[in-house]
Each structure stands twice: as C-alpha cells, then as structure tokens.
C-alpha cells in the first residue's frame, strides 16, 4: 500500500510549524510513506508573513509557495512524492484546498476580500477539491463550530491531533451530508508527533487531481499510526 500525509505544516511558511521541509520529508520517507501534501496556513491564517505590510499580495504568495517548491526540489533526492495544497482559515474554521497552484493564486488576489463561502464556491468552480479540516475542533480562540456542507467536497473525519469525540462527530457530519471522508495528521512537528493519520492506496498517486478523483470515488483507506506504542491501527476500510 502507498501511504500519504494529507495535512502537513512546514517551517518557515506556517508560523506554528516547528520542522523544515527537509526534516518532514526525511521523517515521512523513513517511516515508509509514499508522499506528502504540504498544506501550510494560507494568508488568511497562521501564515508567517501575514502581518508584514512591506510585502505585496504577490510577494506573500511567492513566499507561501516557497516551502512547497523546496519540497519539489528535494523530492527525488529524498525519495518521496510531494504535492501542493493550501489550508484556508476563517475564525478558526479551516479548509484544505487541493488542485490550485501558484499561478492561480497569483492571478486571483480578489479572494482575500471574498466572503468565505463565496471563496470556497469560486475555488470549486475553478477546479479545486475542498475538504473541511477538523470541523468539530474546540479551542479557546474558536468562538463556535461552523459547518460548510454545501461548500466542500469532503470532511477530515480523522485528524490525528484531535480526540475520538471530535473525529466521531466529523464522521457523522460527513455521513449525514454524503461527503467524502479523508484523514490527516495536521502535523506541525514531523517526528515529534505522537499520532499520525492519512490515506493509503493500492497504487501510487499520479498527481493532485488523481488524489481528488480517487477520494471522490471512495477509493483509498484511512489509517492512523500510534507512534507512542509504535503500532499501526487501521481505522476505516
């Protein structure tokens, strides 16, 4: 089976990430993963240059994409596939966006002024595959749970950083609305993470579009890895 990390943050682009691109790629290669999706916090979230007024929108996008571009360059050397994704944010409610690239974001600065639901619908119309990340996460900075079932294709029903209750509610949400199910680690610290989650397939992914198509077709299996016990637990077939 070919395992993939679908939700990963790297330093320096994500302000809260603790490990570099190289450190992450080497970690995932060493534990047998076939690939990772780098999904750093976008300009509307915990992006390292979010409040840098000296940078234009275009400059911020170029910096934002720099971690992924580094990953692309390192991929062959390290021996792991690297794919591009984005994590959008709205008051602590987050969305994983796959299928749009650097040129697209450079061409659409207007997204920064859009209402979030309009932004998600626009991205969908442009070919994006969108997953609501950890929809039932509760934190002090999140005023209340917000659901966007009409604006997303899928739900992250296993987030390795959350507990059973929050993930179970996410799974119910996906089932109630007939949305795709995904899993991811939301990893900010590479090998320091105590638990991982992802999606595995019988054959390797060709590209991001292939990932989206397979998930929408119900292919792939969600898994978790409990690193505290060095055990692997298959959570969904």
Where would I find each of the regions flagged by the language model?
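Extended substrate/RNA-proximal surfaces in nucleic-acid metabolism proteins
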Residues: 42-156, 161-162, 216, 220-224
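Charged catalytic cores and adjacent phosphate/nucleic-acid-binding surfaces used
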Residues: 1-6, 10-11, 21-26, 91-104, ...
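Short, solvent-exposed loop/turn segments at secondary-structure boundaries
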Residues: 14-19, 107-110
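Catalytic domains of carbohydrate-active enzymes, especially glycoside hydrolases
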Residues: 23-39
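Active-site flanking residues adjacent to catalytic metal/cofactor-binding acidic residues
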Residues: 6, 39, 86, 133, ...
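Ser/Thr-glycine-rich phosphate-binding loops at phosphate-binding pockets of nucleotides
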Residues: 10-11, 35-40, 44
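A short helix->loop->beta-strand "cap" motif at the edges of active sites that frequently abuts
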Residues: 33, 80, 177-179
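Mobile, glycine- and charge-enriched loop segments
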Residues: 1-16, 120-127
């Amino acid at each position: 089976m070919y395992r993939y990390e679908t939700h990963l943050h790297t330093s320096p682009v994500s302000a809260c990430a603790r490990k570099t691109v190289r450190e992450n790629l080497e970690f995932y290669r060493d534990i047998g993963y076939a690939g990772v999706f780098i999904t750093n916090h976008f300009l509307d979230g915990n992006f390292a240059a979010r409040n840098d007024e000296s940078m234009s929108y275009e400059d911020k996008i170029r910096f934002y994409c720099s971690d992924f571009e580094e990953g692309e360059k390192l991929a062959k050397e390290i021996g792991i596939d690297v794919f591009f994704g984005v994590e959008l944010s709205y008051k602590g409610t987050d969305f994983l966006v796959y299928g749009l690239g650097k040129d697209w974001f450079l061409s659409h600065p207007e997204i920064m002024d859009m209402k979030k639901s309009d932004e998600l619908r626009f991205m969908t119309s442009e070919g994006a595959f969108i997953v609501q990340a950890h929809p039932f996460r509760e934190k002090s900075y999140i005023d209340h749970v917000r659901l966007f079932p009409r604006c997303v294709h899928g739900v992250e029903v296993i987030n390795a950083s959350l507990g059973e209750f929050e993930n179970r509610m996410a799974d119910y949400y996906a089932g109630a609305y007939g949305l795709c199910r995904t899993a991811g680690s939301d990893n900010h610290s590479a090998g320091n993470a105590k638990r991982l989650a992802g999606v595995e397939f019988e054959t390797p992914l060709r590209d991001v579009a292939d990932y989206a198509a397979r998930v929408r077709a119900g292919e792939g299996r969600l898994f978790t890895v409990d690193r505290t016990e060095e055990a692997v637990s298959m959570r969904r077939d």
